[in-house]
Amino acid sequence: MKVLALGGSGDMGRMAVSILLESPNATSITVADNNYERAKHFVDLVGSDKLKAVEIDVTEKNKLIELISSHDFVMNTVGPFYKFASMILDAVIEAKKPYVDICDDWKPTLDLLEMDDRAKKAGITAIIGIGASPGITNLMAVVACSKLDEVDDLITAWGYGTGERIGSKLSLYSIYNIVKLKVTDFWLKNCLII
């Protein structure tokens, strides 16, 4: 399987590509980045014959569709997701290729879920939000809810400290997302899969 790793030389992309390299199903992995030198440096550092580097500006739709079309599967770690997720999934649907991403923003998640019918009509599977949070936290929520008689609301969130050992504070961005990531029956039924 020829895998296209959009953002494959970024922080999260490098980890995902490293894991993909262990899969016998991934016969080749194209590390695509808006900075060719960064992608090439990562590919050279890893030193696997399975990897190659390409430069892509994901805002250039026709070039993106052409690149996607030459692969069997797309993994997207390009951020920020509020800026790029919808345009990338739109191109993936047009190219009719299976897709996964690690979208961690609530608003683009809702936008991506709105593309469900288009993805189904294109005959593709698109799985969004398969990182740590959302992703693992959503699966943990499903397990937790299955152990309870009734669930009215469920809130998942992640946060990080300021680096202080005592009295660490969440960033305003994290607080904003905690408030917005109120998960109800809708999220559990949809499991963030389109």
What do the PLM-derived regions correspond to, one by one?
Residues 10, 35-37:
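Helix N-cap at the beta1-alpha1 junction of Rossmann-like dinucleotide-binding domains, i.e.
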Residues 42-51:
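Short, conserved SAM-binding/catalytic segment
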Residues 55-70, 77-80:
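Conserved Rossmann-fold cofactor-binding substructure of NAD(P)-dependent oxidoreductases
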Residues 80, 91-109:
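ADP-ribose/adenylate-binding Rossmann-like module
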Residues 102-125:
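Rossmann-fold NAD(P)-binding glycine/threonine-rich loop
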